[in-house]
Amino acid sequence: MKFWGLFFLLFSGIASAQGFDHAHKTWDALVKKHVILIDAGKGSQIRYAELAKERAALKGYLESLAAIKEEEFNAWSRPQRMAFLINAYNAFTAEKILTRYPNIKSIWDFGKLFGNPFKDEFFSLLGRKFTLDRIEHETLRKPGAYDEPRVHFAVNCAAIGCPMLREEAYVAERLEAQLEQQAVRFLSDRPRNRVSGQGRLEVSKIFDWFKEDWSSGYQGIQSREKYFAKYAKLLSDDPEQQKLVAEGKAPISFLDYDWTLNDVRK
């Protein structure tokens, strides 16, 4: 009896893992249709008005995410778990916006102290009530869990200042390449990351808010400055400025964050 009980549990786990769509096909189809690339592919906007017409499909996808229990999730590979969490963050954020669209200009219209959209338990995940902050800060950024600062370039907070929403779903098989492309896109986006005429490195507030994420030895890099040095050629076209960044000598300042909704307004 013990053998058959063990067999049943094992079989159930395998069947469950096989049952979940790790290609995230529904979300993939939605973003391919409603995410518009701008600025030579370095940014994106969302056609919320059109996405709203397919809200039933979005809700169906969210229900498939919510159906996954923590024990199933823990049995997946690291890339599968990361792709799941990133897609969940982005899809639940889009759904949050649609609950008020078109009468919304910023995600902060929900409120900061009361109704904070990032702290609101408006969905369930892994068998319990969840928030957007819980996905990002308590799960993806949890020390020792993934130690992957590029998640900041993948999760999208529905704001112009945020790294772009990717025009496809994140999938385990290509996650490394997808995250790296997101990093390159964001660091190449001059309105959000650049070197000024005075040789000052002006970068997104993300690098201020989450400074410690680039100080944990990621890819052998021990600081934010060393990370910028690796991508010096993306931050400026000027060889002298590139040299300054590559040597870690450029002073750093942080740009104001634009919380305007990343909407394609007609």
What are the roles of these predicted feature ranges?
Residues F8-A17:
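Hydrophobic h-region of N-terminal signal peptides that target proteins for export
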